[in-house]
Amino acid sequence: MFTRYKIIRSFRELKQLVEACLNTGYASVDFETNAEGIYKDTFKPTILSVSFQVGSGCSIPLQHFDESVKEIPWLKWLQYFGRRVVENPNIVKVAQNFKFDNQIFVKYGIYVRGTVID
């Protein structure tokens, strides 16, 4: 199977990703972190990986060494995605160990609505 994977490097691409999730009604999400405890001051979500269909996916660099490619701070990117996708009850969220990912969303003021398949 051919797999397409993209690193989101501009706000325009982030908007396109959100549109794709809205169009399919699905978003598979998974955070990568710096492995610090979530409640430590040193905790950092580094990447949010998202897929909206089989065979494709995107990585959104957050507090990652590649952050310099973005014109908008990482938290604004996360909140933009979160408000439109994670908080959208019409989009089915798919995850593995969502209780961890959800803790990160909540830490940054994003509250899941709708169906979650874990």
Region locations from a protein language model:
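Conserved RNase H-like, two-metal-ion catalytic cores of nucleic-acid enzymes
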Residues: 1-118
